[in-house]
């Protein structure tokens, strides 16, 4: 997960390629969008109530998608969405995550580019600003918000290559910048098929979840907290996306959302770890902050 970094696939694609969709919806008034873009949580908002995921399939000079592969990706996405909804119920939260872009074709887009894509951080930084502009111009967010009745929209970018998946999130301190929050999901990791648990892990970042397997000064994740989670919550999906035997499952998730992740998502108002590990307050829920806005 990264503050201002998204997978190079979309960033380059949006800059150099063409974004299209079979449908041509009508936009709402720009004033509505302007008001929506003042929310401190970024485009994905809070994972309570209804949220929508927009699927964007990326093709470059040496990779493309066929229909069978796209449906396979959509299957994993549906597994991830169902998992997240079940986890919400564990914390008595009503979570509806609309993610099936075949049942909802207005949520499926494609990107083409002649540039060869990879997951390098350097390119992600270079093209992130271009991505924000291009998505705003090409994706009908107003129509999506009106049709699905939500101000919670995340973007999932699918790249048919091996790479490290990542997510670009909005911080309170960003103001109007980096508003559109996106997860870039590679079809493979170390040349093995990626699993649904990684999809869920990256998607949860969109709504405020932190990586719990590594320290982060910006996000207030200390080495002591990482050790604590590893000992007490080793199956938390933000700590590990593997099974207890270290395996990756394509269409099944055996991990769960434990209380530290639930706190960051806004599903729990407080937890013992908040005081013990000096976790920052979350206001509003599900929001990222580097602490300078408090």
PLM ranges: what are they?
Residues 1-8:
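Positively charged n-region of N-terminal signal peptides that target proteins for export
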Residues 9-20:
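Bacterial N-terminal signal peptides
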